[in-house]
């Protein structure tokens, strides 16, 4: 039996060559944030069988960027200016990994966000990022 996907999550709405190997990804869209989640599997791990820090950092960056886009009404594009991640635990194959975001401040040229990354509800990392707001390409 496959573990269920938590309530409110649906197949992720955006595909990317970077995240294709990590599929299936799921997202939950709220009024001012986007959470990303996935069931941890072998391709998500390092040589010790634990979740890879690069996966955590990349998903946090994506989720915080989407959250800023959501807060700004999806009318602009964003590029990451800075990203910091503190690793405080680890995740294992089979656990549900979820990136929960909060947009701290939006402006005409910058957006700031933070996130907690949890494996089965236990915090394994925290991250924060700054994004440059740019005109969306038509």
Regions found by a protein language model. Give the residues of each.
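Terminal targeting signals and extreme-terminal segments of soluble enzymes
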Residues: 1-138
